[in-house]
């Protein structure tokens, strides 16, 4: 039997994710490094969680590294035209969150705007297709069809999402061969992305409560591209 966590506890963990993205939206600048971004996130998470036991892990990748999906922070220096992915998992108390947003240093190119719109549409179709009783392996194919229809077929090599809560990553994941059923009370993520290896990549991820009727979004944070453009 799966361990279930309350949506209220997940939302408390997500308060730290929200603070982290706010810190980046106001604090990111050209000339900063991935490690600088990490420190902004650390300060924000620590401020929200205070003395409560907590930790965080995540992907802090900028520039062409975004096309390789994931990685720890480095001394890479952000420059105009870069993208930056923050995929952040926070443990607050005994419960984990897991979200992702992508930042743009300057106005995104037309192709990047099209890719981002495809990512959001991909997430939306995932939301429409998941409810209690859904077979996990059935979720990703419609997401991939959305990307292909918009010109980005084959550009998402990873799963479409997974369970979260007692740990930052739990099965079932939304991937081929994972034929477990999603259950009411599960907390899941949907994390579509588009990756142009050697150039750039992007990803958006939210956390949801699985119900008999569908998904309840637990992270009502902005996801529109204009909210994540860093002035250069």
Q: Where are the regions a protein language model picked out?
A:
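Active-site neighborhoods and metal-handling regions in enzymes and metal-associated proteins
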Residues: 1-232
């Amino acid at each position: 039997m799966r361990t279930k966590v309350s949506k209220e506890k997940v939302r408390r963990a997500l308060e730290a994710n929200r603070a982290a993205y706010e810190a980046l939206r106001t604090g990111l600048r050209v000339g900063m490094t991935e490690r600088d971004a990490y420190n902004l996130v650390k300060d924000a998470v620590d401020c929200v969680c205070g003395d409560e036991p907590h930790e965080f892990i995540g992907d802090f990748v900028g520039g062409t590294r975004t096309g390789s999906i994931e990685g720890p922070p480095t001394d890479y220096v952000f420059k105009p035209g870069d993208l930056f992915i923050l995929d952040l998992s926070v443990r607050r108390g005994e419960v984990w969150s897991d979200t992702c947003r992508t930042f743009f240093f300057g106005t995104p190119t037309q192709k990047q705007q099209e890719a981002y719109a495809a990512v959001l549409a991909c997430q939306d179709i995932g939301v429409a297709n998941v409810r209690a009783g859904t077979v996990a392996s059935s979720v990703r194919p419609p997401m991939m069809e959305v990307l292909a229809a918009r010109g980005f077929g084959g550009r998402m090599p990873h799963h479409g999402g997974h369970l979260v809560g007692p740990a930052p990553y739990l099965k079932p994941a939304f991937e081929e061969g994972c034929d477990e059923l999603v259950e009411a009370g599960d907390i899941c993520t949907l994390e579509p992305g588009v990756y142009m290896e050697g150039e750039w990549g992007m990803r958006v991820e939210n956390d949801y409560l699985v119900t008999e009727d569908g998904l309840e979004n637990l992270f009502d944070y902005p996801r529109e591209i204009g909210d994540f453009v860093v002035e250069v």
